[in-house]
C-alpha cells in the first residue's frame, strides 16, 4: 500500500493507493494541479518530477518528497 500525504494551501492531502502506478499517477496529478499556482514551474520540471518519483517508487527509495512552494508539498511513502 502506498500513501500520499501533503498540503495544498489549506487542504490536507491524504490518499492511499494500492498499486505503484496508481500512486505515481495520483502524485503527479497533484503536482500538475500545483503547477497552476506557480510561475517558475515548467512542463519540463513536471517531466523531471515524474521521472524522479517513478524511479524512487520502483527502486524502493521512499519516501519521495516534493515541494512546489512552502504552501504546497507532497510525500509518497510505502506502508
Report the location of each language-model feature.
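Short aromatic-glycine-(Arg/Gly/Cys) micro-motifs in beta-strand/loop hairpins
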Residues: 1-12, 26-30
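Hydrophobic beta-strand residues in large extracellular and virion-surface proteins
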Residues: 2-4, 15-17, 23, 74-76
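A short, exposed loop/beta-hairpin motif centered on an aromatic-Gly-Thr core
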Residues: 8-22, 36, 40
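Short, mixed-charge low-complexity intrinsically disordered segments
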Residues: 29-79
Amino acid at each position: 500500500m502506498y500513501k500520499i500525504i501533503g498540503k495544498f494551501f489549506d487542504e490536507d492531502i491524504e490518499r492511499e493507493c494500492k498499486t505503484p502506478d496508481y500512486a505515481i499517477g495520483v502524485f503527479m496529478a497533484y503536482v500538475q494541479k500545483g503547477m497552476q499556482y506557480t510561475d517558475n514551474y515548467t512542463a519540463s520540471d513536471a517531466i523531471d518530477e515524474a521521472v524522479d518519483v517513478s524511479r524512487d517508487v520502483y527502486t524502493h527509495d521512499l519516501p519521495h518528497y516534493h515541494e512546489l512552494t512552502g504552501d504546497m508539498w507532497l510525500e509518497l511513502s510505502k506502508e
